[in-house]
């Protein structure tokens, strides 16, 4: 009877170990299910929140408008004696070379070598000594030109370089200074491109509700439906969408609608990813529930069997 009880207890112990293994496996599946469901939740929230921006992140400046501003720095064409002559650049390059580090190094070497020959070369002829003295004189000219340039600094009369008209215009655009940009492009051509840039600035800075800026935004929105050949440039989708959202409350041109459709596709992709992750998470959660339920069932059964065995006379606990 004791042998039988021992065998029964061994089988009960095996069932108990199997139940513990099922519980451990169910816990792992539950953790995996929670992780996948969290990913599904993130995908769903992203798909719900993702939408095209109603304000342009950066201002798109068409080349047809930027080209109306000169990129020449004021005074860079040259002036004074010799200004604009074809050989001016060559002369400037030569003078820069003569006052450069290579000539300075060559001058120092000439002074050192020729001086050493004069000091230690007493047996050399008078001609050689004359040549050495000439080398020293030329080398001193080279070195002195570099020293003078280093002391005076060179080009002191040039003053700080002024930005070109195009640089000033682009700086105003980057600063999103609506009034300054409007002032700079008043006398320029490319009216459609000018309205396009001003409308972006108005929307970006929240000025599109003011009367003057509102008119500009309306003109730019109306021109977005025109073909690029008629406009002279191709509007950027983000800018066209923001302008039309401000003017009409919805995109109307093909460019703005295409931009919105791209964002809708992105949102649909996130929703699809969330759906797939949700299905996988549900399967893992169901498997985890099954394993944990089986483990609980085995544990309850083992407990009942142990209780029955303990109640028998002579049974080993």
UniProtKB/Swiss-Prot annotation:
GO terms for biological process: response to tellurium ion. Pfam families: TrbC. Keywords: Plasmid, Tellurium resistance. Belongs to the kla operon, which is associated with cryptic tellurite resistance, and IncW plasmid fertility inhibition. This is Protein KlaC. It comes from Escherichia coli. The gene is klaC.
């Amino acid at each position: 009877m004791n042998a039988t009880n021992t065998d029964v207890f061994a089988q009960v112990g095996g069932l108990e170990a199997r139940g513990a293994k099922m519980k451990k496996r169910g816990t792992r599946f539950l953790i995996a299910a929670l992780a996948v469901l969290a990913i599904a939740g993130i995908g769903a929230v992203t798909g719900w929140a993702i939408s095209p921006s109603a304000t342009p992140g950066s201002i798109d400046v068409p080349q047809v408008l930027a080209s109306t501003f000169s990129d020449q720095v004021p005074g860079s064409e040259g002036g004074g004696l010799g200004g604009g002559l074809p050989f001016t650049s060559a002369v400037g390059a030569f003078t820069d070379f003569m006052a450069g580090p290579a000539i300075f190094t060559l001058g120092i070497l000439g002074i050192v070598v020729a001086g050493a020959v004069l000091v230690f070369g007493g047996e050399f002829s008078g001609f050689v000594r004359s040549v050495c003295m000439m080398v020293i004189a030329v080398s001193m000219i080279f070195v002195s030109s570099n020293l003078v340039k280093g002391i005076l600094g060179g080009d002191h009369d040039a003053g700080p370089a002024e930005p070109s008209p195009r640089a000033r215009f682009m700086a105003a655009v980057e600063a999103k200074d609506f009034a300054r940009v409007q002032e700079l492009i008043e006398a320029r051509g490319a009216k459609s491109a000018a309205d396009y840039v001003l409308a972006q600035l108005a929307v970006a800075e929240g000025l599109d509700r003011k009367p003057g800026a509102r008119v500009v935004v309306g003109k730019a929105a109306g021109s977005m439906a025109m073909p690029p050949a008629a406009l002279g440039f191709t509007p950027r989708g983000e800018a066209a969408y923001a302008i039309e959202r401000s003017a009409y409350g919805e995109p109307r041109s093909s460019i703005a609608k295409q931009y919105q459709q791209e964002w809708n596709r992105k949102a649909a992709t996130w929703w699809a990813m969330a759906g797939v992750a949700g299905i996988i998470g549900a399967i893992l959660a169901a498997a985890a529930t099954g394993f944990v339920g089986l483990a609980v069932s085995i544990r309850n059964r083992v407990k009942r069997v142990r209780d029955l065995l303990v109640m028998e006379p002579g049974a080993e606990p």
